[in-house]
């Protein structure tokens, strides 16, 4: 039989997920798409409590804020630009924007408190990185999660290096290890990293590849470094792993029919396929029957007869 694709043969997951886990998902909208499906199918998941985050430093900033439970204040409130008069913050996606600053603060701090409690108890953290490009607010000297349509003159566009990417991710791991050592109520955490298959074509095909390659190399440094610290050949005790979502779309699916109309975002069919591949990789075999039952139950409850 002719072989018509190059399948991505991912190794068996060393950091799996289970229905008994509490999971935090942070990062790009791909993380959000998969996270919503996991929640629909019965997993205990908190998804992007600051909204979609694209770069590694913004993910680190969100983790630090959850650990400190550092609430947002009026100083953090920014009026969105380009004629949008709503309020948000440079730490949030615009999905958090509200008409009044006080309403934004109320909702943002409520989400923060709920997320901080979930993060304290969760034992699995799944981080999906979208791009190594970021924007630094010049006056505040702060890498923002979202520019909020503010004037371009307020920012400097930067591309994180491999070292800066790996340092941000390693800092997340180190902070969690340190907190677990000093706080018995803080659950030790294992991490799954992945790179979003969403293509950022603002800088063209070559620029997108450079950005994604930076993320891949940064993740590889962290995962391989943590694996080297674990001397267990069977993978027991490993604290980080990598799921090849980007490679599956680029090398296995490899066709525009698996993309949405913008030719950059994966189609809903592709998201479903990646979720199936992820759970086949991460979920223990004995829980697949429960997964199928939960999928059937969800589809039945959301079925609308014609």
Language model segments and positions:
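Extracellular glycan-modifying ectodomains
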Residues: 1-231, 236-306
């Amino acid at each position: 039989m002719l072989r018509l694709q190059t399948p991505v043969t991912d190794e068996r997951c060393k950091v799996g997920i289970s229905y008994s886990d509490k999971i935090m998902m942070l990062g790009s909208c791909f993380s959000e798409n998969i996270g919503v499906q996991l929640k629909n199918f019965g997993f205990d998941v908190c998804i992007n409590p600051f909204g979609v985050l694209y770069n590694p430093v913004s993910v680190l900033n969100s983790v630090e804020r959850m650990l400190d439970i550092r609430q947002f204040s009026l100083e953090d409130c920014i009026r969105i630009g380009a004629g949008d008069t709503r309020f948000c913050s440079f730490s949030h996606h615009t999905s958090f924007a509200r008409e009044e600053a006080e309403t934004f603060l109320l909702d943002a701090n409520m989400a923060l408190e709920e997320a901080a409690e979930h993060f304290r108890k969760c034992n699995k953290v799944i981080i999906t990185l979208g791009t190594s490009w970021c924007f630094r607010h010049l006056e505040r000297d702060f890498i923002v999660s979202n520019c909020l349509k503010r004037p371009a003159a307020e920012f400097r566009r930067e591309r994180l290096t491999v070292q800066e990417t790996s340092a941000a991710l390693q800092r997340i791991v180190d902070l969690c290890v340190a907190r677990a050592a000093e706080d018995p109520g803080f659950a030790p955490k294992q991490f799954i990293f992945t790179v979003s298959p969403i293509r950022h074509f603002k800088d063209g095909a070559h620029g997108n590849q450079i950005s994604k390659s930076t993320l891949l190399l940064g993740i590889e440094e962290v995962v391989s470094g943590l694996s080297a610290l674990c001397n267990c050949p069977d993978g027991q005790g490993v604290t980080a792993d990598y799921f090849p979502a980007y490679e599956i779309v680029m090398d296995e699916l490899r066709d525009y029919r698996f993309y949405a109309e913008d030719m950059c975002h994966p189609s809903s069919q592709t998201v479903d396929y990646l979720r199936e591949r992820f759970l086949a990789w991460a979920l223990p075999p004995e829980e697949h029957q429960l997964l199928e039952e939960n999928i059937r139950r969800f589809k039945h409850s959301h079925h609308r007869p014609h």
